[in-house]
């Protein structure tokens, strides 16, 4: 982001269905890169009520009660529907999300466009959509393991793992009824499927594997490779990511 993005929230499925005949939006962030001092906002730093929320929006102090984090590459945030959030200037984020376009913009720092107009806000719609729960820490903690996938998020809408690798890895998707997306965040690798199709993937590129893919082999081109792997739903009956690789 070149500038701070708006403070916003997404509704959960039931509210989105009632209001928009749509699904809600749960998402996650993986910090690919960050300028020095770049920040993200996720959740509330103190307990507030819907009434106080409305007052703070009106007097431009809503950011005072949002939890703010100075970020670095590799940081992960899970954002279930209802959690207020925003991306700060200087943050380069890979975002995995539920398929939905429903966003309630709460606060946009009173910015105006070239015509002197402010952006539309949805503060009243957001009030009912917000989860006002306060957590001690909104970051997702994990420990990277070399040459093994590490699961970051598993929710009803998607599962995401990170690969930090220098050695070749094979992945078994024979029991997975979903497409798979790989996002290359660092280095370069070759991905070859069970039918012999092979493609080079460089940093900043993504590849989508169809649901018919049975297995793939990932071979680093040179040096260290970092990949995000994500698929559409959480299959709790499947082997863990580590058990699906060899």
Residue ranges: model-predicted function:
Residues 71-89, 201-214:
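Conserved metal-binding segment of the jelly-roll/cupin
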Residues 84, 188-190, 215, 224:
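Structural motif
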Residues 236-243:
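Conserved small/polar residues in nucleotide/adenosyl-binding loops
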Residues 246:
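Gly/Pro- and small hydrophobic-enriched strand-loop and loop-to-helix capping segments
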